[in-house]
């Protein structure tokens, strides 16, 4: 069961899992101060990178412009027209519209994806359609939480009774005590992959050193930090 995870920038990742290649929040072109985005130069590098070839599914947790670019997504679908598109707002005539509390998708015979509507971090974003996902293949489960509010009871309900083998979470889940407690006591993953960090040149607020300092405080058997663009991590 081969699984590798490769980031683009910001929250974007590509999961290469057996014959499947899933992109989550990979394509975006709006920079938020203190974070990074997929500039035209980085976008061209991504299109040429081995980890970002022939995606099967383009999944976007939500449609904020630092997570989703319609222009880049259309270019990718022109390049790989077989890629499915799944996101929680109607953006294209042909897409998988994530709606309702939960939504299930199966890819091939061996990959199951359970999507769950989760609250976005921050009260002003409470109405934003936002979905996390649990992916399962050969009994191995991967949690993608997106920009879920830290400690959200909806996320606790989503993972209740589930053995999470890998959790992919933004860095505040490690830097904030509330986030660490939720990871250790509720999600309880066997492995933790921390992402959504800015590149060094964009780190206006010291997110990178704060996250590095906090890694040793989270009690998870294996922890990885995704802090470079196109940094491949072999999970299993």
Give a label for each model feature.
Residues 1-23, 27-32, 36-41, 112, ...:
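Zn-dependent metallo-beta-lactamase
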Residues 4-7, 22-25, 112-119, 141-147, ...:
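Active-site-proximal beta-strand elements of phosphoester/diester hydrolases
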Residues 18-58, 70-74, 123, 149-162:
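Pre-active-site segment of Zn-dependent metallo-hydrolases
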Residues 23-25, 54-66, 85-89, 143-148, ...:
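Active-site neighborhood of phospho(di)ester-bond hydrolases with catalytic His/Asp-centered motifs
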Residues 31, 63-70, 91-94, 105, ...:
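Active-site environment of divalent metal-dependent phosphoester hydrolases
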Residues 45-105:
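Active-site HxH/HxHxD metal-binding segment of metal-dependent hydrolases
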Residues 96-109, 127, 157-161, 181-236:
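Binuclear metal-ion centers of metallo-dependent hydrolases, dominated by the metallo-beta-lactamase
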Residues 120-186:
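Active-site-proximal loop/helix segments of hydrolase catalytic cores
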